[in-house]
Structures are given as C-alpha cells and as structure tokens.
Amino acid sequence: CLDWLTPFSLFTGVSVVVLYATLGCGWLIFKTEKALQNKMFEFMPKLIITLFVIFGCVSIYTPLVHHQIAERWFSQPQIFYFSPVPVLVLLFTFLALKACKQRKEFLPFIYTLALVILAYTGFLISLWPYVIPPSVTIWEAAAPASSQLFALIGALILIPIILIYTGLSYWVFRDKVRI
C-alpha cells in the first residue's frame, strides 16, 4: 500500500520544495528592493548550494539503483552526448552564486531557470523513450490519434489565450514591488 513511500521519494519531494524556493527567491530578488531584496540576496546562495547538493545526490543515487540509467549515461558514445548536462549544471550553479555575490537582480532567477531546464533534460534523457521504466515506451503509452487531435485543437485555442493573459499580467506588474 505504501510502496511509493521510500527515502528516495521523500528526498525528491523535499528537492522539489527546495527547487521552487530557489525559483521564488530569485523572483523576489528581481521584483523587490531594499530590505526584502537584501534578505533574499543572503538566502539565495544557501538555496543554490542546497539545490546543487540535491542534484548531486540524485545524480549519484539514480545510476547506482537503476542499472539501465547507468548504462545509458556511462556507455559510449552516449557519455559524450550526455556529459554537457552535469557540466552545465556546475556552470550555472557557479554563475548563479557569482550573480548573487555581485548583487545582479535578474540573473539569479535566469540561472535558476536554466538549472530547472537542465534537471528536466537530465531526467528526460535518462528515461527516454520509456515513461514507465523499463517496460512501457512513450509510444505504447500514447493515447489514440483521435484523442491526441482533440487535445491538439484545444491546445491551439487555449495556449494563445494563456500567453496573451500571461503577457498582459507581466506588463501590468512589470515594475518592482515597493514595500
């Protein structure tokens, strides 16, 4: 009944909280000033280092437990294709810490977004093409073509509306928040 409740699942749950806290802290650095911004500049390096340690723990633990992922990451020629992901994680972690030290207002958020994209990229290339490793591929799990067409039509209608609304809200709230 509680097979899903493992130390690793709890760890990844905490990881998601730290990830979103880091994104939120970067956003607050960008959108606030004075006392709150100073507090976030103090807090952000701690979050970035914690996030980097979490990424490292997941990156070490996962290949040890899942041999298919270890084989995928560390065999040739894949190692040459996949190695930019951890290198870029290290680079963007360093850049985010440097941006905090130099008190750059927008860059910590951008670098954290890059870390999020790299985390999902690492996850995707580790599992591709399986959605339920190691047995069900993305094509076997896909919905029928008629359902996909219905979803596509809905997306074509709703995504522009969402983008317009989001753009408008960013335009309305484009200035810094003054407290």
Which residue ranges define each predicted feature?
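Divalent metal-coordination and catalytic microenvironments
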Residues: 23, 127, 169
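Hydrophobic alpha-helical transmembrane segments in multi-pass integral membrane proteins
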Residues: 54-64, 118-135
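Short, membrane-exposed interhelical loops at transmembrane-helix boundaries
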Residues: 132-151
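Central hydrophobic cores of alpha-helical transmembrane segments
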Residues: 109-117
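Individual transmembrane alpha-helices with interfacial aromatic-anchor signatures
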Residues: 5, 9, 146-157
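Extramembrane terminal tails and long inter-domain/linker segments of multi-pass membrane proteins
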Residues: 138-140, 144, 156, 165-179
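Long, contiguous internal "core" modules enriched in hydrophobic/ aromatic residues
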Residues: 1-104, 108
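Alpha-helical transmembrane segments of multi-pass membrane proteins
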Residues: 16-19, 118-123, 159-162
